[in-house]
Structure formats: C-alpha cells, structure tokens
Amino acid sequence: MTNEELLQIIEKAAREKATHLSLNNNQLSSLPPEICQLSNLTWLSLYNNQLSSLPPEICQLSNLISLRLDHNQLSSLPLEISQLSNLITLDLNNNRLSNLPPEISQLSNLRSLSLFNNQLSSLPPEISQLSNLTELYLNHNQLSSLPPEFSQLSNLRSLSLNHNQLSSLPPEFSQFSNLTWLCLNHNQLSNLPPEISQFSNLITLHLSDNQLSSLPPEISQLSTLTWLSLNHNQFISLPPEICQLSNLTELSLNHNQLSSLPPEICQLSNLVELDLSNNQLSSLPPEFSQLSNLSWLDLSNNQLSSLLPEFSQLSNLTELYLNNNPQLSSPPPEIVEQGTEAILTYLRARLEAKG
C-alpha cells in the first residue's frame, strides 16, 4: 500500500467517524501523523506490516480499546503510549522490543498484554502498576529474572513465561493467587519455591524442558490442578506429592529417567491422559489398573518386560502405545503391532486363565 492510498483510507475513515480499522498485511513501513484524525477509533489492527516505529500521534487515539501491532519490526514504543489510557488489549508479539518504557504502567485499564517473541531481557518495575491485567504473555524472550514488583499483578489469570532463561522463581511469585494457567516450559528451573502452594486456583501448570529433579511437597496443595506437564526434566522417580493431586486429568512425564512408579499412583483416579514415554520403566505396579478413567496412555520407549493381566481392567482405555519396549514379551510384539484392542483382549484372556 502506498502512502497516498493510506492517506485516502485515513481520510475516508475520519469522515465516516469509523470505530474499527484494519490495515493488516499491507507492508506498511510507517504511519503518517494524520493517523491522529481517527479520534473515534476503538479498535485498530496493524498486524503483519513492516513498522519499525510508531508516530507519537498514534497516542492521540484516546478512545482505543484494542490495538494490534504484532508481527512488525518495532524496536521501541513511544513514551506517549501512556496516553492510550482506555486500552484493554495491546498486542505487541513478534516484534524486536528489547525494553518497555516505564510509561506503559499508565495503561491502567489494560487487561491483556501480549509481548511474546521479542528481545526483552528485563521488565520495568512499573509493570506492577497494571493492576487490571488478567493475561500476560512474555514467552520467547530473554528474561533471566523477574522484578520483585512483578508479583503485584494480583489479578493475573494467565501467565506465559516459557522459552526464557529463568533459573528460579521469587517467593513473591506466590502472590498470583488468581492464576489459573501458568506456562514455564523451556527455562532453566532446577526447583520451585514452596510458596507455589498458594496458587489455589491453578488449573494448568506447564513445567516441561527445565532441570527439575524434584517438586516441593507443597505442590500437593494445588487441589484445582487438572493438567500438569513435566516433560524433559530430570526426574528419576515420580514425586509422591503428584499422587495427591486428585483432580488431575492430564499428566505428562515423557523424556525423564523414571524407572518405576509408586503404588500411590492409583490415587489419581480422574486421570484421562498419561504420557510416560521415553523413560526407563521396567514394570508397572498392580495398582496401576485402578486408573479407571484412563483413556490415553503412552508407554513407548521404555524397558517394560511385561504387563500384568489386571491391566485389562482399564475399561476406558482406547489408545495405548507400547512400541519400542525391546524386552516386552507379554503381550508379544505381534499383538502389540495390532493395537490397543488386541493388547487388551490378550491381557483379558490371560486374566481369565489366571482366575
């Protein structure tokens, strides 16, 4: 789109007192100062252009509620951004931002802030003043720590910090008591603070691709948790605390070093999906057959030699993966190749013969 065409669009939108304007996918490298004429705009989308900066005049659009600037080449934000005090949603993901101006703290009505895929190595303490923020996406940046003030964002419901360089979480992190979704995949975490127990509303917790070998006992207090992913860590045994998370429906522990499972695993009676692939499991406890709601189970790439006949009592199991267990003799390879139903039929027959 040429600058002349853009000016015509702006002039027409101003004349019509437009409230919504989409300028996505137009290879725009700049915006003219005339953008400030669109005083009635509440929604502006500039997705997927080539903007490297914003004119200060854009900050005169004081009625804006939603502003999309994702997939551009922005390396900084104008200080005047603080004037967009009615903004509720601000999308800046997939840019080149290396820092945020402290003035961003004045966007007091902001509910959703998306900053993933930038080059942020730190956050301004002032970010803590965004007290209405419920969604914050900071994944795929270069954050190695969080400011203590960060924990004052007490209304956060969803927080994404995956693909950063975090090696620890501050104890203050526990003040996010309203969090329901937390993603910390692909960091450098070797432990979690006991204060994690105070995430009393947490439903989903992603901790894959870290350096965890244990969990704090306090994690057992996350009674609302339904989804827990711990893939690609350093667990050699299943932390017993996990077995007290009775509302878990999905648990993923692939690519660890588990050699056995505790009998207490049967307490996870609501489990629907369980991924234990790529571990070193040589057997499963008899109590495993009590996971009556299990429908999807991946045990591939382990060291299993046999499955107990009682395994056939998993009446809801529809998908079972046993490939690449080189020592598995019961069920034999030719049965395993036929799939889940054949495996369960084989084990059922063995159970009947046993009984």
Predicted segments, located by residue:
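Hydrophobic secondary-structure block in the mid-to-C-terminal portion of proteins
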Residues: 300-301, 323
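Acidic, glycine-rich calcium-binding repeat modules characteristic of RTX/beta-roll
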Residues: 307
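The feature captures the LRR N-terminal capping module
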Residues: 1-47, 52, 56-71, 75-94, ...
